[in-house]
Amino acid sequence: MAEHVEGPLYYETMGRTGPVVAFVHPNPMDQSCWMFQMAQLSTWFRCIAIDIPGYGRSPKATKGLTMRDIAQACWEAIDDAFPGESAILAGCSTGSAIAPHMYHLRPDKTKALVLCGTGYNPRKEFAHHRIKSYQDRGVDFRWDYTFQDFSPAFRTTPLGHYFANLFAERNVYADADSIIYQFEALLQPEAADHHSAIKAPTIILSGSEDGAHQSAFALKDRIPGCEMRVLGGAGHACQIEQPGLFNRWMLEFLGKHGLMPASPKPMM
């Protein structure tokens, strides 16, 4: 079992045939932020969306949590659902930070990386601000924080409020200390070759209205052969705001690298 995690992570699956795609969510959301991807990609793939420690319905973390611990716990969830299987790893924000650690744990089991809401920010100043917000407000901060993951236009929509309410309704299961430990883990230094040693096919899908968008180009340059597409008008959680385009580009990328089942043909 992964260290500093008080039990197996909660996950949900969709799809019964095809390669495995594992989705890892951003802060402050949970696995349901991938509902649009799970619904469509389950036509071709066995999908698993995982709640990381302290979010959704996963157990708490303890002090000393590392990114490697979270990555190990995510692989254990995949092993529980699909024993012995390789996986395509998809992450948003925090999930995109976890995915490379998952790759380094099992490079032979990682078929590809699909990253969004991400960039290269070695100083990670944002983490200190998030820690203070959770210390001051606890899990109630999650509702306001959800809107920061959206573009200004999407924040005012009924769907934006739907997602904010969806995640906040699960605050009874969330744990502020665990979320703080996750940000502390994120602040730990990475190996010099953390990105340059990635050999799996990788794509960054970046929203033009994401605060991390400009730093996504720097991350692209650090990962060998990394591809990138920009979703115009989308924010940090671009997979929620523009699921049709996000899914299309994800499927095109997987097809390009021989990871897409031959039938049925996607409606591109």
Regions found by a protein language model. Give the residues of each.
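Active-site loop/oxyanion-hole signature of alpha/beta-hydrolase fold enzymes
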Residues: 39, 48-90, 248-251
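Conserved alpha/beta-hydrolase catalytic His-Asp/Glu region
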Residues: 124-126, 140-196
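Short beta-strand/loop motif that positions the catalytic acidic residue
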Residues: 198, 204-206
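Gly/Ala-rich beta-loop-alpha elbow adjacent to hydrolase catalytic centers
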Residues: 91-95, 99
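Flexible "cap/lid" loop of the alpha/beta hydrolase fold
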Residues: 100-105, 109-141
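Conserved alpha/beta-hydrolase "acid-adjacent" motif
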Residues: 211-217
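Catalytic active-site module of serine/aspartate enzymes centered on a nucleophile-bearing elbow/loop
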Residues: 226-268
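Conserved HGGG/HGGXW glycine-rich cap/lid loop of the alpha/beta-hydrolase fold
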Residues: 7-59
